[in-house]
Amino acid sequence: MKKYILGGIAAVLIVIGCMWVAKGHNCKKENTAVAVSANDDNSQFVTLTDVVPDVILEIRYFSTYNFAGQRIDGYEQPIALLTKAAADSLKAVSDDVKAQGYRLKIYDAYRPQKAVDHFVRWASDLSATEMKPYFYPDLDKSVLFKQEYIAEKSGHTRGSTVDLTLFDMNTEKELDMGGTFDWFGPESHPDFCGNLDTGEYTGDNQLSPKGRSITAEQFAHRLILRKAMLAHGFKPFPTEWWHFTLKDEPFPDTYFNFPVKQK
């Protein structure tokens, strides 16, 4: 009798475990799209230009000029969506840098899970390397998962992360940051060639596989953006100078999947 009871309990536990995984909890990191419960509630999101009217948009994943060379799933319009909390904080950043002669230029904001799944599929296709010369010339595509350039989840999907740069209102050009958005390499690290604690330019480029470097001016430009973002409640990302997340993000454990389009 005990054997039958224990067998029944085990069966129930297996069913419960399967239900738990189906709801989107993934214990093992694999090179496949993570299963998340599709959350299509965009009620707490705003169109960024409604909050920051003078922001410049260049939504790379709506275009084909990105590391995949394809328009990415889920980007139905070239607009930026963010949680209201993140958009309000970004307005404060905009006011700050505007006083210094700059405008914000946005590459990406909220990113649906279906877009992240698209990245995962692309990274798994080792033959699709059309954009390698422009975004990852020093890397074999097979290492993108291992080195975490591509992952199954993204902070962008929680709605309070933004990729951006500065636009110089005097020159009417992007401020020269010494590297392009979505460059896969150490040259994109915020501390590349400099000390973030002291703000000192060191010129240390030992991590660059090709001995690339950035100038003192380019490092200083990165610091202008970084200081403004940190001053208004955003936290940086250690490997991308353009990537910031609201510290007090309202949905730290929720991954949304509604498309990027006008509300």
Predicted regions and their residues:
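Extracytoplasmic cell-surface/polysaccharide-interacting catalytic and binding patches
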Residues: 19-109, 116-239, 249-263
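Conserved metal-phosphate-binding beta-hairpin within the catalytic cores
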Residues: 244
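Sec-dependent N-terminal signal peptides of Gram-positive bacterial secreted proteins and lipoproteins
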Residues: 12-16
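N-terminal Sec-pathway targeting helices
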Residues: 1-11
